[in-house]
Amino acid sequence: MLHRYLPMTEEDKKEMLQTIGVQTIDELFSDIPESVRFKGDLKIKEAKSEPELLKELSQIASKNANLKEYASFLGAGVYDHYAPVIVDHVISRSEFYTAYTPYQPEISQGELQAIFEFQTMICELTGMDVANSSMYDGGTALAEAAMLAAGHTRKKKILVSSAVHPESRAVLETYAKGQHLEVVEINHKDGVTDLDVLQSEVDDTVACVIVQYPNFFGQVEKLADIEKIVHQQKSLFIVSSNPLSLGALTPPGKFGADIVIGDAQPFGIPTQFGGPHCGYFATTKAFMRKIPGRLVGQTVDSDGKRGFVLTLQAREQHIRRDKATSNICSNQALNALAASVAMTALGKQGVKEMARQNISKAQYAKRQFEAKGFTVTFAGPFFNEFVVDCKRPVKEVNDALLQKNIIGGYDLGRDYKEHENHMLVAVTELRTKEEIDTLVNEMGAIQ
């Protein structure tokens, strides 16, 4: 073997050449004229040994602002949360790490049970009846929810709050274009969905209304008031929710939500650039046969022992591709497992305590900003994010903070012209009092 990763011997080459009727490599390429063949050595560096390569890659990676050396106040959909050490241990086990869709239940009970437990925990958090095995991420889960609503109601108009994550709204627009659906944005007022505008837009042509809870600005939407407006015209009520926040907030299911979706990233999934993430999708029983993605159910075998299987598979593309509820094939099962392990390790009280710490530390940060003379833009209740008026370009502020080993908040001016110079600050349970005080003092010094 000439190369550790290319297990081809000289005997292998000889056998392959003989099979196609040539004796040498030169004879194989004889139809290429000598005049156009490359001669000499390529102008690239010589190969490195594994230790040399690891050293060089580590040096390159060290240029990044990483969460081991920087205090992060950046959220906007991806958060720096505590992940129990056991998470990586469990998801690294080969029976989980390399598993694919468990079509054969007799040899996939471990994987199926893990998915079933994920579904169960999502239902408990959201207050819904049924949850699927996961989606790609929160954005695609939101778009799939809108597609379900349009198909169920046979209506073409989708109302979405402008306080929903901008990237999720962009994914929705992409899905809607292919299905010839109309997406109408409902403006926000004082950091939450403008209910007067919503009331004026909801009519018998609306398939669904989509809001986020807490919303993109961190504010807690008034779901009870929104639900009354939405269901007046028998439209579906879709709520995108941070699952960790539901350890403290009343779950959307208690407010009459028809579909609850979101991203399980806060539970055991690191803040890696670009993902992967783990979307979740939960509904009432009324939509059980229309929910996209895999569903795992509990049953008993011929001996009466508990077992787990993929259920209601007639909805899926490997059974009826042309009539499938969705053509999502593989899901984020490994990340769903990570979320399940994290939630299990934390336990109910741990999830509640984690949510409580997010609230209390974010409230402390808000008070410190106000004491320093900053304006916190919205006055409503929030979870772990709030908006600060920087009075200058947020990029300038963040560039200065990076010099102090601080990753600043999200620049809202990128998505909302009316919020130029405003920073969305995220404060999770991992931030210390000292880190919060340093952030406020450094921003005060460059105000």
Swiss-Prot record:
Q: Which reaction does it catalyse?
A: N(6)-[(R)-lipoyl]-L-lysyl-[glycine-cleavage complex H protein] + glycine + H(+) = N(6)-[(R)-S(8)-aminomethyldihydrolipoyl]-L-lysyl-[glycine-cleavage complex H protein] + CO2
Check the record and name the Gene3D superfamilies matching this protein: Aspartate Aminotransferase, domain 1 (3.90.1150.10), Type I PLP-dependent aspartate aminotransferase-like (Major domain) (3.40.640.10)
The molecular function terms in GO held by this entry are:
glycine dehydrogenase (decarboxylating) activity
Query: Which CDD domains does this UniProt record tie to the protein?
Result: GDC-P (cd00613)
- Annotated keywords: Oxidoreductase
Q: Does the keyword RNA-binding apply?
A: no
UniProt-listed Enzyme Commission number(s):
1.4.4.2
Query: Which EC main class describes this enzyme?
Result: oxidoreductase
Cell wall biogenesis/degradation keyword on record: no
The UniProt entry's GO biological process terms, in alphabetical order, are: glycine decarboxylation via glycine cleavage system; nucleoside metabolic process
> What family, per the record?
Belongs to the GcvP family. N-terminal subunit subfamily.
- Give the protein's biological function: The glycine cleavage system catalyzes the degradation of glycine. The P protein binds the alpha-amino group of glycine through its pyridoxal phosphate cofactor; CO(2) is released and the remaining methylamine moiety is then transferred to the lipoamide cofactor of the H protein.
What is annotated about its quaternary structure and interactions? Answer: The glycine cleavage system is composed of four proteins: P, T, L and H. In this organism, the P 'protein' is a heterodimer of two subunits.
Name of the protein this chain belongs to: Probable glycine dehydrogenase (decarboxylating) subunit 1
Which species does the entry assign this protein to?
Answer: Bacillus thuringiensis subsp. konkukian (strain 97-27)
